[in-house]
């Protein structure tokens, strides 16, 4: 009996079924006169680095709404616990509410255990919460702090994945900031070296990304102290006017002039009070 051979095309490791589905949906929407919603574009540069005695976190201060600068001096470094802080990139409301929720949960955890929370505990709480919402919470975070086991620095993505690294940057200006880190980072830096490095990385994001701008905020966390430097530097200072820009009357020629008097109609009204006695 002859065997029948059927050609089966090779199957790769990736499935593009969802891409084909999205293309069909987009074509169907176009026929009906609709458009698929676009992904929200946000802009930020946040970064962190581990130095010899602790952590340095940094962020810019520009908040955008589309292509409009909504706030020139917003704070993107959020309080988690006395020894842990978190930088937020993405949707501002999501980063604010997410860090506030985890901060309150860590406070309850601290009251229950009677000691300061560990950084890995905050990392676990954040990643579990973000993974539960499958990326619909637009919060990209840089978590840093110092506990009994030493300094720790994590990057947390909106879908819940995390990395523990000696230097981290996230946001739309992260490519420029990462270039500075990869060029100048070295282990066991002193505090001033780490502050200057993070400041330079944030400045690279500010000058090379339209979504980042204004000032540079830093947060230095060590075992014995916490310094919140706001602002640390102001790379985009507003220029001063060099002269008087108001023209004198008569500088510009007037070709025609027409004066229209206003017609005012005066109405008189009398009000009679009602006797309620």
Curated annotation (Swiss-Prot):
Any idea which GO molecular function terms this record carries? Answer: endopeptidase activity; threonine-type endopeptidase activity
**Reactions accelerated catalytically:** Cleavage of peptide bonds with very broad specificity
What keywords does the record list, in alphabetical order? Cytoplasm, Host-virus interaction, Hydrolase, Nucleus, Protease, Proteasome, Threonine protease, Zymogen
Propeptide section residues: 1-43
Q: What tissues express this gene product?
A: Expressed at a low level in colonic mucosa. Up-regulated in colorectal cancer tissues.
- InterPro entries assigned to the protein according to its UniProt record, in alphabetical order: Ntn_hydrolases_N, Pept_T1A_subB, Proteasome_bsu_C, Proteasome_bsu_CS, Proteasome_sua/b, Proteasome_suB-type
Can you quote a single GO CC term?
ficolin-1-rich granule lumen
Signal sequence, start to end? none
The answer on whether this UniProt entry bears the keyword Hydrolase reads yes
Give a Pfam family name: Pr_beta_C
Where do the catalytic residues lie? 44
Chief location category: cytoplasm
Q: Does the keyword Coiled coil apply?
A: no
The compartments listed are:
Cytoplasm; Nucleus
Superkingdom = Eukaryota
PROSITE patterns associated with the record: PROTEASOME_BETA_1, PROTEASOME_BETA_2
Give the E.C. number(s).
3.4.25.1
What biological-process terms (Gene Ontology) are attached? proteasome-mediated ubiquitin-dependent protein catabolic process
Oligomeric state and interaction partners are given as: The 26S proteasome consists of a 20S proteasome core and two 19S regulatory subunits. The 20S proteasome core is a barrel-shaped complex made of 28 subunits that are arranged in four stacked rings. The two outer rings are each formed by seven alpha subunits, and the two inner rings are formed by seven beta subunits. The proteolytic activity is exerted by three beta-subunits PSMB5, PSMB6 and PSMB7.
Primary role = Component of the 20S core proteasome complex involved in the proteolytic degradation of most intracellular proteins. This complex plays numerous essential roles within the cell by associating with different regulatory particles. Associated with two 19S regulatory particles, forms the 26S proteasome and thus participates in the ATP-dependent degradation of ubiquitinated proteins.
Q: Which family does it belong to?
A: Belongs to the peptidase T1B family.
Protein name (Swiss-Prot/TrEMBL): Proteasome subunit beta type-7
What gene name is listed for this protein?
Answer: PSMB7
């Amino acid at each position: 009996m002859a065997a029948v051979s059927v050609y089966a095309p090779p199957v790769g490791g990736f499935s593009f079924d969802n891409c084909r589905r999205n293309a069909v949906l987009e074509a169907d929407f176009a026929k009906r006169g609709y458009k698929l919603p676009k992904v929200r574009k946000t802009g930020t540069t946040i970064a962190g680095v581990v130095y010899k005695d602790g952590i340095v976190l940094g962020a810019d201060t520009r908040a955008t709404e589309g292509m409009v600068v909504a706030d020139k001096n917003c704070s993107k470094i959020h309080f988690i616990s006395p020894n842990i802080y978190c930088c937020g990139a993405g949707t501002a409301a999501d980063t604010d509410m997410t860090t506030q929720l985890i901060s309150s949960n860590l406070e309850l955890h601290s009251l229950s255990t009677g000691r300061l929370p560990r950084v890995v505990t905050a990392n676990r709480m954040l990643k579990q919460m973000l993974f539960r919402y499958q990326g619909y919470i637009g919060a990209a975070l840089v978590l840093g702090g110092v506990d009994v086991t030493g300094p720790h620095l994590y990057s947390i993505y909106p879908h819940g994945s995390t990395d523990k690294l000696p230097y981290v940057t996230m946001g739309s200006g992260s490519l420029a900031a990462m270039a500075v880190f990869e060029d100048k980072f070295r282990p066991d830096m002193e505090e001033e070296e780490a502050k200057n490095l993070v400041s330079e990385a944030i400045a690279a994001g500010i000058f090379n990304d339209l979504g980042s701008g204004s000032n540079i905020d830093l947060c230095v966390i060590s075992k014995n102290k916490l310094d919140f430097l706001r602002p640390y530097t102001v790379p985009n200072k507003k220029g001063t006017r060099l002269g008087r820009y108001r023209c004198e009357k008569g500088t510009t020629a007037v070709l025609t002039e027409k004066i229209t008097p206003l017609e005012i109609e005066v109405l008189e009204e009398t009000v009679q009070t009602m006797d309620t006695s």
